[in-house]
């Protein structure tokens, strides 16, 4: 296995859907399938927060969602659970600044995809040095999807990272919608990452398709 190429990583970040069982009143597998039909390009299993599954139940759901992703050829990333990622042979792991050290995670997962959350230039540079394949940057806009979300920074944080010489793929997160996706891509993001914009939508398929079209339009300018 070899590390994912930067160009492929950028393409995969176009529409990055994050969810767990706690993010929708509907079964997670139903929501994910519709989102995949709509054009999601990367998926992160984030089973955290009040009511989140644990142990065998968490692993069973992870495997179910992973099978869906494989059927669509979409990489399956696990949030902050290296042991689970290794147990099910996930495609990668994403860690935040308060999770396990990124350098240690890289050592454990080998060449699997490693994503790291960053909120400023210093954190971004440290993540690059630790071996991150992409950065999750935000929150760009106010969000209620994450109980521990920091203050929104606006698209300018993306410009600051690019101006500081950060060249690895970046996905923007936090309050992203089809209406503002163009703005964040133009500011320096390679794609958008969402939870509620898809998970809470009346039609996850239509929501994913709208995001995909917005990112595509911004990229081709």
Swiss-Prot record:
Its cofactor is Mg(2+). Keywords: Magnesium, Metal-binding, Thiamine biosynthesis, Transferase. Pfam families: TMP-TENI. SUPFAM superfamilies: Thiamin phosphate synthase. Pathway: Cofactor biosynthesis; thiamine diphosphate biosynthesis; thiamine phosphate from 4-amino-2-methyl-5-diphosphomethylpyrimidine and 4-methyl-5-(2-phosphoethyl)-thiazole: step 1/1. GO terms for biological process: thiamine biosynthetic process; thiamine diphosphate biosynthetic process. Binds 1 Mg(2+) ion per subunit. It is an enzyme of class 2 (transferase). It catalyses: 2-[(2R,5Z)-2-carboxy-4-methylthiazol-5(2H)-ylidene]ethyl phosphate + 4-amino-2-methyl-5-(diphosphooxymethyl)pyrimidine + 2 H(+) = thiamine phosphate + CO2 + diphosphate; 2-(2-carboxy-4-methylthiazol-5-yl)ethyl phosphate + 4-amino-2-methyl-5-(diphosphooxymethyl)pyrimidine + 2 H(+) = thiamine phosphate + CO2 + diphosphate; 4-methyl-5-(2-phosphooxyethyl)-thiazole + 4-amino-2-methyl-5-(diphosphooxymethyl)pyrimidine + H(+) = thiamine phosphate + diphosphate. Mg(2+) binds at residues 80, 99. 4-amino-2-methyl-5-(diphosphooxymethyl)pyrimidine binds at residues 44-48, 79, 117, 146. GO terms for molecular function: magnesium ion binding; thiamine-phosphate diphosphorylase activity. The keyword Transferase applies. Its EC number is 2.5.1.3. GO terms for cellular component: cytoplasm. 2-[(2R,5Z)-2-carboxy-4-methylthiazol-5(2H)-ylidene]ethyl phosphate binds at residues 143-145, 175, 195-196. Belongs to the thiamine-phosphate synthase family. Condenses 4-methyl-5-(beta-hydroxyethyl)thiazole monophosphate (THZ-P) and 2-methyl-4-amino-5-hydroxymethyl pyrimidine pyrophosphate (HMP-PP) to form thiamine monophosphate (TMP). This is Thiamine-phosphate synthase. The lineage of its organism: Bacteria, Bacillati, Bacillota, Bacilli, Bacillales.
